[in-house]
From Swiss-Prot:
Name of this protein: NADH-ubiquinone oxidoreductase chain 4L
Gene: mt:ND4L
Membrane topology recorded in Swiss-Prot or TrEMBL: Multi-pass membrane protein
EC number: 7.1.1.2
Subcellular location(s) per record: Mitochondrion membrane
Leading EC class: translocase
Organism of this sequence: Drosophila nasuta F (Fruit fly)
Length: 96
């Protein structure tokens, strides 16, 4: 029963994060924040699943490492875009 509650809650949050990602396409920073929210929910789902099945949590640490690298790469693209174009509008991103 508790697993059903965890999975349904995390799926609702995942769908909410996807909706925020699709609806906030004006600024790159808001898109990056919604992507980080989605990654956080995926980490929560992975952590619950690994603890339920009594597996080791090393894979979740690798997942966190890759998600931090993804966040740093996104922020570096954001800084580069602001330096070259002066704003973070996603419509001007297609010019590159």
């Amino acid at each position: 029963m508790i697993m059903f509650l965890y999975s349904s809650f995390s799926m609702i949050l995942f769908i909410l994060g996807l909706f925020c990602f699709v609806s906030n396409r004006k600024h790159l920073l808001s898109m990056l924040l919604s992507l980080e929210f989605i990654v956080l929910i995926l980490f929560f789902m992975l952590f619950i699943y690994l603890n339920l099945m009594n597996y080791e949590n090393y894979f979740s640490m690798m997942f966190l490492t890759f998600s931090v690298c993804e966040g740093a790469l996104g922020l570096s693209i954001l800084v580069s875009m602001i330096r070259t174009h002066g704003n973070d509008y996603f419509q001007s991103f297609s010019i590159m």
